[in-house]
From Swiss-Prot:
One of its GO terms (cellular component) is nucleus. Residues 37-68, 101-127, 255-406, 431-501, 568-622, 644-691, 705-758 are annotated as: Disordered. This is Transcriptional activator FLO8. Residues 73-105 form the LisH domain. It is found in: Nucleus. Required for diploid filamentous growth, haploid invasive growth and flocculation. Putative transcriptional activator of FLO1. Residues 41-55, 307-317, 341-353 have a biased composition (Low complexity). Keywords: Activator, Nucleus, Transcription, Transcription regulation. Residues 270-285, 318-340, 371-395, 460-480, 584-593, 660-675 have a biased composition (Polar residues). It comes from the Eukaryota. Coiled coil: none annotated.
């Protein structure tokens, strides 16, 4: 921009008197410079845009023959149709089709003749890309397409097409499974990255999925195939992702469905989520093999006795409890249907029952069953007898009481307490008198004068005694039960859940051949203590033929059942129920049977009966057994080589049990059943003679023997000859006493006490610690003169 100079101002400098004009000129100059600069920038930008547009317009596009061919699919199809018509010798049809389809051909040639490659190579650009086949490519393609289409649409097809189609389907399934597992692996990898546990491992998704499923698989290797891309495949645009059934990849419970995959070897050591939880908290699908049908465990809340020999020690397996309704009685056929059973809680006494059963006659005898149960000793526990049922090859351990299983208000405590009352203290809680045959010499008659201490002993004894189930004369089963205040009469219960020794007799035998027995069924305590040593008060040293040094099992109480034994049939029949007990604070008792004459007037029987034998047989399976027997009104025959009789004084009065001090107690104030002191052998070489021995393996004492013979009131000494139970007849009484083990017997001190009444002279014998040969236990025969149940103050087996 040019400015004109004023003629009046040659230097083009305005005068001073016009200051405003100078500043305005300066501003106009700056604005003009700025406008000129902006206009040039805009002009340059416009030129650049024009150049870019020109370059975009003038930019040549790359020609691609394949792209053109794909874009012109219809033209390609027309060319293949023309090729098919030409090779099918349809020249006129091909020329007409080429003319109508506007195909590029040599116009100088006749369309009927078709294109000629030799003359028109330069002009046939369109047909240069057609695949040359003998019959035309379109025909061959159509054959393959139609065959596969029929196969896929279940319309048939050739065999090769079907095989090809199956291969294609299998490949598609594998690819689909692989894609699904890859997606799952990507998800796991993403979760691991979020937790900070991923360190850029390159793992095959198939191996990872198999490892997560718990299936064994070869170690993962580096993937080398391009198609096996470890990168998660995006599922967008793939419509057939979820169209195939895929096996589950994380199924913790294999029992939920049929398609569940059971884990075989989880990669980690934790089987809590993948393995079945069958034995995690209980004995689950079956009863333990340790339990027997009639033997509840110590967890039994009903109060039934438990078997302490069959304790289940499994860590995670608790033994189930057999409810009373599921318990099956040992002999369900012993109870006849036509014999009524008394439902009264008070039953008759033993003597009244005996009289009533005698009146029943032979008709009641024919109704008896011949089922018996044998009591043998357990091999593992010396105090646990086994019960063997006839016809069975196996034996079950008998019920063993435990002090741990104390349930004062349960049925077992009631039964124990009732046993103590009936067996030992039958006159304490009763307002009625005992039978006349038992009043004369019953130890409990005098013991009832001290009800306080006896009751204390009874409570301690009540937790380990068991009811005895015996078959009466009519063949019915009866279980001893009772309350705390029950009379001396026994209670007859129909409960069959408690296994016990069942005794019966042959109904065809005469009553005169039936022998009275006392069957002792005991329940030793687990908490056993070694046997205490007692001083030998006899004039000769105690005989010890071998001690196995096993602890004795102590039991406070043993229940006695009066029974009948038939010597010809060898069977035992329970009679009159349980009788009475002796001292309740004694060592462990074992099953014992002592043959005595029939009940009744004891003094009358002594004058009319001939001597009988008491056969003490050692039980099977015990290693040591101590037998304590207190006899009354007997004589001791001492000798070195010959048996010399030495009579004890006999007052001739009725036998009376007297309360004295127990020599086994350190206090000396406990009441115990004992008898006055008797005479002892006068020589150190003198001993007690076992007069009759059953077999060759019996105990033989050289120069020492014991024979206990009673005197009749007319001072006639009758010594019983050696007889057996099977050959006894008439009024001779012979029975077997079957304790429970391999017995060893040592003559021990006499436990006697003196009192102001010297009418009864008793002797306390203790046989203990005699070594026996296995399975050959001896039989100990004590010749007793007319011995009945009143002649035994104390019968006890320790072992």
């Amino acid at each position: 921009m040019s400015y004109k100079v004023n003629s009046s101002y040659p230097d083009s400098i305005p005068p001073t008197e016009q200051p405003y004009m100078a500043s305005q000129y300066k501003q106009d100059l700056q604005s003009n410079i700025a406008m000129a600069t902006n206009s040039e920038q805009q002009r340059q930008q416009q030129q650049q845009q024009q150049q870019q547009q020109q370059q975009w317009i003038n930019q040549p596009t790359a020609e691609n023959s394949d792209l053109k061919e794909k874009m012109n699919c219809k033209n390609t199809l027309n060319e293949y149709i023309f090729d098919f018509l030409t090779k099918s010798s349809l020249k006129n049809t091909a020329a007409a089709f080429a003319q109508d389809a506007h195909l590029d051909r040599d116009k100088g040639q006749n369309p009927i003749d078709g294109p000629k490659s030799k003359e028109n190579n330069g002009n046939q650009n369109t047909f240069s890309k057609v695949v040359d086949t003998p019959q035309g490519f379109l025909y061959e393609w159509w054959q393959i397409f139609w065959d596969i289409f029929n196969t896929s649409s279940s319309r048939g097809g050739s065999e090769f097409a079907q095989q090809y189609y199956q291969l294609v389907l299998q490949e598609q399934r594998q690819e689909q499974i692989y894609r699904s597992l890859a997606v799952h692996a990507a998800r796991l990898q993403h979760d691991a990255e979020r937790r900070g546990e991923y360190s850029n491992e390159d793992i095959d998704p198939m191996h990872l999925a198999a490892m997560m499923l718990g299936n064994p698989m070869a170690p993962a290797v580096q993937m080398r195939n391009v198609n096996m891309n470890p990168i998660p495949i995006p599922m967008v645009g793939n419509p057939i992702v979820n169209n195939f059934s895929i096996p589950p990849y994380n199924n913790a419970n294999p029992t939920t469905g049929a398609t569940a995959v059971a884990p075989t070897a989880p990669p980690s050591g934790d089987f809590t989520n993948v393995g079945p939880t069958q034995n995690r908290s209980q004995n689950v699908t079956g009863w333990p093999v340790y339990n027997y049908p009639m033997q509840p465990t110590t967890e039994n809340p009903v109060g039934n006795p438990c078997n302490n020999n069959t304790t289940n020690n499994t860590t995670n397996n608790k033994s189930p409890v057999n409810q009373p309704k599921s318990l099956k009685t040992m002999h369900s056929t012993d109870k006849p249907n036509n014999v009524p059973t008394s439902k009264s809680t008070r039953s008759r006494s033993a003597t009244s029952k005996a009289k009533g059963k005698v009146k029943a006659g032979l008709v009641a005898k024919r109704r008896r069953k011949n089922n018996t149960a044998t009591v043998s000793a357990g091999s593992t526990n010396a105090g646990s007898p086994n019960i063997t049922t006839p016809g069975s090859a196996t034996s079950e351990p008998a019920m063993v009481g435990s002090r741990v299983n104390k349930t004062p208000r349960s049925d077992i405590a009631t039964n124990f307490r009732n046993q103590a009352i009936i067996f030992g203290e039958e006159d304490i809680y009763s307002n009625s008198k005992s039978s006349p045959s038992l009043d004369g010499a019953s130890p409990s008659a005098l013991a009832s004068k001290q009800p306080t201490k006896v009751r204390k002993n009874t409570k301690k004894a009540s937790t380990s005694a068991f009811p005895v189930e015996s078959t009466n004369k009519l063949g019915g089963n009866s279980v001893v039960t009772g309350k705390k205040r029950s009379p001396p009469n026994t209670r007859m219960s129909r409960r069959k859940s408690t296994p016990s020794v069942i005794l019966n007799a042959d109904a065809t035998k005469d009553e005169n051949n039936m022998l009275r027995t006392f069957s002792n069924t005991i329940a030793p305590n687990i908490h056993s203590a070694p046997p205490t040593k007692t001083a030998n008060s006899l004039p000769f040293p105690g005989i010890n033929l071998g001690s196995f040094n096993k602890p004795a099992v102590s039991s406070p109480l043993s229940s006695v059942t009066e029974s009948c034994f038939d010597p010809e049939s060898g069977k035992i029949a329970g009679k009159n129920g349980p009788k009475r007990a002796v001292n309740s604070k004694v060592s462990a008792s074992s099953p014992l049977s002592i043959a005595t004459p029939r009940s009744g007037d004891a003094q009358k029987q002594r004058s009319s009966k001939v001597p009988g034998n008491v056969v003490i047989k050692p039980p099977h399976g015990f290693s040591t057994t101590n037998l304590n027997i207190t006899l009354k009104n007997s004589k001791i025959i001492t000798s070195q080589n010959n048996t010399v009789s030495q009579e004890l004084p006999n007052g001739g009065n009725i036998l009376e049990a007297q309360v004295g001090n127990d020599s086994r107690s350190s206090k000396g104030n406990r009441n115990t059943l004992s008898t006055p002191e008797e005479k002892k052998p006068s020589s150190n070489n003198q001993g007690y003679d076992f007069d009759a021995l059953k077999n060759s393996s019996s105990l033989l004492f050289p120069n020492q023997a014991y024979a206990s013979n009673n005197r009749t009131p007319n001072e006639n000494s009758n010594v019983a000859d050696e007889t057996s139970a099977s050959t006894n007849s008439g009024d001779n009484d012979n029975t077997l006493i079957q304790p429970s083990s391999n017995v060893g017997t040592t003559l021990g001190p006499q436990q006697t006490s003196t009192n102001e009444n010297q009418n009864v002279h008793s002797q306390n014998l203790k046989f203990g610690n005699i070594g026996m040969v296995e399975d050959q236990g001896p039989d100990y025969d004590l010749n007793l003169l007319d011995t009945n149940e009143n002649d035994f103050n104390f019968i006890n087996w320790e072992g």
